[in-house]
């Protein structure tokens, strides 16, 4: 990224807002010629870099914005839409080899509908995600073989049809670029083979049906993999050498001009609305206060109407380690012994197509664990107990569906490291435990919750199987420990994925329902730490997602809410976690709040190159999913002082770059008699629309209305 000093005396003498043609030879050796306003490129202009890169097109306040053409010294070119320095919108990219892509872009990535023509004669037309073929698409090879169907991460994956130029075809399931699962291979003479396909001959199983004319012939299904598909290789996309957003200069000198004596006080900064609804000329700056925080401070003339500093404290590991002497130490040992037994028990390979009997509530296994051990269980130092597995085949298949490795699963829960108990039980009375690596959360369950999960398990399984990007909680196991002796105590618990298992510190977390009664945390801002779960009336941000992510988010929230409504579930919430990216860049050892100065000519403090490297790094790209590890922006909001229960605050113009995590949690509360009574009782005291306990249909509608107000498209 180059640095451009715009300090010509002529610029300061011109009236504010006047555009004119300028030619700027920059200290770096770069050269700009074109429209110029307020000491920044603004309008149409050309920028030449010393390394041979060139941009010709529209500028807006020092950034490439609108239509433009970027060329590289290698001969590669991009022509199309730009936004904030990124290739974003519709555009055509021709790489140095001659491969051509024409279609949609989001933040330098091929994303949306697009066509790729390869110099060797191959062509792909279809959907893209994060730079790779993903969704529905058609790929045609130069020899006229073609595939039509689903793609994932640049490979044929899902249901699809391959048609060879000789008339043969395969219809069925694909995985990682090859047939996998149920499918039919047909020859041009009418004969066909139907069965289960796999590269592993042991898993291959099917029946060959010859045509009346061909008769029997010697053929092996593995020929499809090693002969028929040998020429059907999908071409890869050449990496873009240097991204335009990485080349964008940082223009220094603009902010100095804006505060010079040539301007009037009222023209120094665009105005913003303060917390009490008044308008102020808040000039803000990001600074360190020397106490482990970064904060945003207003100048003296707008202090009274400012929001005050946004403080982010260093994140600390949650929970208390359960060691010997802890009241739940033996329960933890029992749990670990049971998990090790359940997961390690030999079992036949399972298909994703489960029989109805696997979901039978009576489908459970009891195992006795005497202290001295038995034929099936090891000796242990805990008390004697019984262990129950609910629907073991279903949960084993769910772990397979969620790509959970059995050995890693056991190591996380049953390894040498102890579990951690969260400091206080939830509102429901349940206790929560975290594995030491933060991957899994274990929650104790009431009998009623257990019944709800078992009842909805068939629908839940079908839903998560059909919706790869579902936001609902991932369940990995449902178990029960029954202590022997006089107490005969039963402890039921479910193992879930931890949404905040991440290498990033979670600086803010929110639990959002869309209701207002009791949805406020009483802690003042100064006492809020990263482990504080804030609620609806504490929310002081709007979450801004890129267009394609936002559209996918809306679709998935609708599908998940429809599923929960059909199952008569209510009282669920959207758990949201924010990692402020500037905090990590400023000080990796002590995470602090990063703020983007919201007004005037000041530029973003985050490097675009950092964002590009994050988005295009192969390891990080693979980790980005809907609700997981997503780059986004948040805008700080403020509630009016005269509106006590205002759910969504007014925008302030303060923006922050974040990594956002979110998912729908607490999905095991049905609208039973207790919730109906709660609704009737509270409705006599409070506004019926403000309380959480409402009919599932009304709950779903209110939840979605609220979520779609606080999550918006980042235009």
UniProtKB/Swiss-Prot annotation:
One MF annotation (Gene Ontology) recorded for this entry: 1-phosphatidylinositol-4-phosphate 5-kinase activity
Occurrences of domain PIPK (ranges): 321-711
Gene Ontology CC annotations of this record: apical plasma membrane; pollen tube
Gene3D superfamilies in the record: 2-Layer Sandwich, Histone H3 K4-specific methyltransferase SET7/9 N-terminal domain, Phosphatidylinositol Phosphate Kinase II Beta
Polar residues bias spans: 255-264
UniProt catalytic activity: a 1,2-diacyl-sn-glycero-3-phospho-(1D-myo-inositol 4-phosphate) + ATP = a 1,2-diacyl-sn-glycero-3-phospho-(1D-myo-inositol-4,5-bisphosphate) + ADP + H(+)
CDD domains named among the record's database cross-references: PIPKc_AtPIP5K_like
Biased composition (Basic and acidic residues): 1-13, 265-276
Residue ranges, annotated region (Disordered): 1-21, 253-306
GO biological process: clathrin-dependent endocytosis; phosphatidylinositol metabolic process
Activation loop: region residues: 671-692
Keywords from the named record: ATP-binding, Kinase, Nucleotide-binding, Repeat, Transferase
Highest taxon of source: Eukaryota
Keyword ATP-binding found: yes
EC number: 2.7.1.68
Stretches forming MORN repeats: 32-54, 55-77, 78-100, 101-123, 124-146, 147-169, 170-192, 193-214
Entry keyword annotation includes Kinase: yes
PANTHER family named among the record's database cross-references: PHOSPHATIDYLINOSITOL 4-PHOSPHATE 5-KINASE 6, PHOSPHATIDYLINOSITOL-4-PHOSPHATE 5-KINASE
Protein name: Phosphatidylinositol 4-phosphate 5-kinase 6
UniProt organism field: Arabidopsis thaliana (Mouse-ear cress)
Name of the coding gene: PIP5K6
